[in-house]
Curated annotation (Swiss-Prot):
One of its GO terms (cellular component) is cytosol. It is an enzyme of class 6 (ligase). Belongs to the class-I aminoacyl-tRNA synthetase family. ATP binds at residue 622. It is found in: Cytoplasm. One of its GO terms (biological process) is leucyl-tRNA aminoacylation. This is Leucine--tRNA ligase. It comes from the Bacteria. Its EC number is 6.1.1.4. Keywords: Aminoacyl-tRNA synthetase, ATP-binding, Cytoplasm, Ligase, Nucleotide-binding, Protein biosynthesis. The lineage of its organism: Bacteria, Pseudomonadati, Pseudomonadota, Gammaproteobacteria, Pasteurellales. It catalyses: tRNA(Leu) + L-leucine + ATP = L-leucyl-tRNA(Leu) + AMP + diphosphate.
Amino acid sequence: MQQQYNPSAIEPKVQQFWAENKVFKAVKDVTKEKYYCLSMLPYPSGKLHMGHVRNYTIGDVVSRYQRMIGKNVLQPMGWDAFGLPAEGAAVKNNTAPAKWTYENIEYMKGQLKMLGFSYDWDREVTTCRQEYYKWEQWFFTELYKKGLVYKKTSTVNWCPNDATVLANEQVHEGCCWRCDTPVEQREIPQWFIKITDYAEELLTHLDNLPQWPDQVKTMQRNWIGRSEGVEITFKIAGSNAELPVYTTRPDTFFGVSYVAIAAAHPLAEMAAENNPALAEFIREAKNTKVAEAELATMEKKGMATGLFAIHPLTGKEVPVWVANFVLMHYGTGAVMAVPAHDERDFEFAQKYGLQINQVIQPLDGSEWDFSKAAYTEHGKLINSAEFDDLNFEQAFNAIADKLESMKVGKRQVNFRLRDWGVSRQRYWGAPIPMMTTEDGEVVTVPMQDLPVILPEDVVMNGVQSPIKADPEWAKTTYNGKPALKETDTFDTFMESSWYYARYTCPQYHEGMLDSDEANYWLPVDQYIGGIEHATMHLLYFRFFHKLLRDAGILNSDEPATKLLCQGMVLADAFYYTSPTNERIWVSPTQVTLERDEKGRIIKATDPEGRELVHSGMTKMSKSKNNGIDPQEMVEKYGADTVRLFMMFASPAEMTLEWQESGVEGAKRFLGRVWNLVYEYSQNPATAALDVAALSKAQKELRRDVHKTIAKVSDDIGRRQTFNTAIAAIMELMNKLTKAPLENEQDKAVMAEALSAVVRMLYPITPHICFELWQALGNNDTIDFAPWVVADESAMVEDEKLVVVQVNGKVRVKLPFRQQQPKMKSKQLRKRMQT
C-alpha cells in the first residue's frame, strides 16, 4: 500500500480489473432474490453533464449496496440514440447523424467507465440500432391489428419556405429556426396509439405505487384528468347541424349565454365561408400555437359566427362565437359558456358585452358582485326553473336525468389525456412500419420484411428528411404490387418506453422479449430520473408496460416498484454586459472570487480583470455557461471524490449546489481514511478481538462503530438518505483518528472498525475501498464482500445516567449499570447521599 492517496493511480487499475473479470455481469438465478436498479438512459449528446453524474451515482450506490446484502443485481446502461439534436449537429458539422451519434456514444461510454459505475456492459442497448427498433416496429404492427393504432389528421408546425414540418423546439417566437419565416399551423395525417383506452387503468393503478413520489403521482393524475360530466347537444338554429358540448357543471346550465367553439371546429369553417373577416380571424387563431398552460393568462379573443345554438331546456337562442381559448383537440372543441360562474367565460363576456346570467347563489344566501368576478363555487340553484333550490349534487343528477330523458344529453366520463401522436416528420428516428398500396389501402409491413431500415449514410441539408427527399426510398411492393412506405418516423418516446424491458434480454433474437428473462427481472425495483419526465416518459413507460402485459409478454402491471427523482445540480453563474448590451456569461471555472467572513461572494472577476455580476446559483446550462465538466473534475480530484461529494452535498431529491470547496473537502476526507488504514497496516493486530477483555474506552469506541453501522444500513437501505449516512461515517472517522493503538485490543477494535468503514464507504467510493480492503489483509475482493452487520450486543451501554428530580428540581444524577440488581429504597437513599 502506498503511503499517499493517489486516485489517478488507483482508479484505472481497479476499473481494468472490473472490466477484465466482468465483475458486474448479471445472470438470472432463481435461488437468489433479484434486484433491478435502473437510471434513465441518456441521450448521447457528446459529453456527460453533472446531472447525469448525480443520477448515475445514486443508482450505483443503490446497486452496490444491494449486491452486498446478497441480492442478484442487474444494473444496465444504454443510449436513447434517436432524436432531433443529431440532425442539427449533422448539418452544423457536415456529417451524418448516425456517425455523430456513434462517436458520442463511444466518448460518453468512456466517461461512464471513468466514474466507476458497476454496469453490466454486455447488456448495453442502443436504440438507433436496427436490432432494437425492429421489435418496436413489429409491436406497432401488432397494436394496429388489435385496433390500438389509427391515423388521423392533426395540426403541425409548417415552414412554408422550407416546405417542411418543424418540431416545437424549432419554432422560435413564431418563426422557423433556420430561415426565420413565420410558421403556419397545418393539418396533416399522423399516426396515434390509443393511450386513452388505458386512461382509467393508468389512473387507478397509481394507487398501487406507494413508493413513487406523491408529486409525480399527482402530476400524472392531473395530466390524465378524469372528470365526470354531461355531454349536451345543442341544435343550430335554421339548420340540421348539431353542436355537442361537454360540461362538468350541468348545475349552471340555465346560465348559458353563448357557446364558444375552436377555430378549427367544422362549424367555424362553415360560418367563415361567406365571412372574410371571420375567415381571417380563424386563420390567425389557427397559426397562433397556444400551450394549454397559457390559456388561463393569455388575452381572450373571439368573433361571432352569426350562428345561434338552441338551448335544449329553455328553447332560447344563444350566439355561437369562435374563441381562441377553446382547443379543438380537447373535449368536443366547443364549450357552453356561463359567464356568471366561470372566470374565463366571465372575462370573455365582459370584453365583448355578452350576457351574464346568475343561476348559482352562495349557500349562505349572500349577494355576489358580478361586476367584479364570476362566482365559481358550488351553491344553490336560482333562475333555473324546476331545479331552483337544489344543491350541486342534486342539480347535477336532476338535470342530467332530464337531458337523458329528452335524448339531448348523456352522462359521460371524460379524460384530459389525448391519444399519443407518434408520427414525426423527421429523419433520425425509427421508420413507421406501414405502407400504402397503389389502390390506397393502408397495410402493415409484414414480419418477414422487418425491420424497415433507416439508411444511415445520408447527407443532411437541414431542410427535408433524406427519406422524404428520396422518392426511391419509399418504393416497395405488397403482394407483388407497388406500394409506398411511410416516410414519417416514430416519436423518440417510443424507444424510451420499453428499453428497460429489453435490457433483460438484449441478445434475444426470437422475439421482442424473452418472457422468462423479462419476468424474472421485472418490474424494476428502483428507477431513478428527473421529475421533469413525470407526465411524458413516465406515463408512456407505464402505458407500454401494460401493452406488453396485454400482449402476453409480461406478467406484471407496472414497470417500476420504486421511483426516486433526483434534484437538479446548480452552480454559480456570472456575466458581464457587452457594449451592445448583451450578457456574456463566464464559466465559474474562469472566475476569481473574493468572499466575506461568512463565505458570501463579494467580488468576482474574469481572467481579463473585468468585474462580473453574480446572478446566483442556477441550474447548470449551456445558455449560462455554468456547467462543470465531470471529466475535468475526475481528472483533478478522482472519481471517488466526485461521487462522494455528489452523495454528501444534498439529499438525493433536493437540488445540489456545486461548490468546489466541498469537492476539496471530500478529497481531504478520503485522504484521512487512506492515512488511517495506512497507519494501521504498518502495525496491524495480531490477536483476535476479545470482547470480554475490552476496557471501558474500547467498548465505547466499538459501540460507536456498531451504532454507525446500524444507522448507515438504515440510511442507505430503507431511507435512502445517503448524505446522512456519509455524515455518520465522517463522525465515526473523527473518533477513530483519535483512538489509541497502544495494545492488541486497541488494534483489534480498530481492525473491526476499519473493516466496517471501508465496507460502508464502498458503494459510494468503490475504487479507494477496493484498495483499502486488500490493505486490511483480505484475500478476496471487496466486490464480493458482504455488507457489515451491526452487533446488537455491542450497542448496549454498560451504564445509563438516571436523573432524580424532587418537586421538579434535579437532586442527583446516578450512573446505573444495565444489569443493575433491584435496589431497596434504603440503598437508593444511601447512594443519593454519597
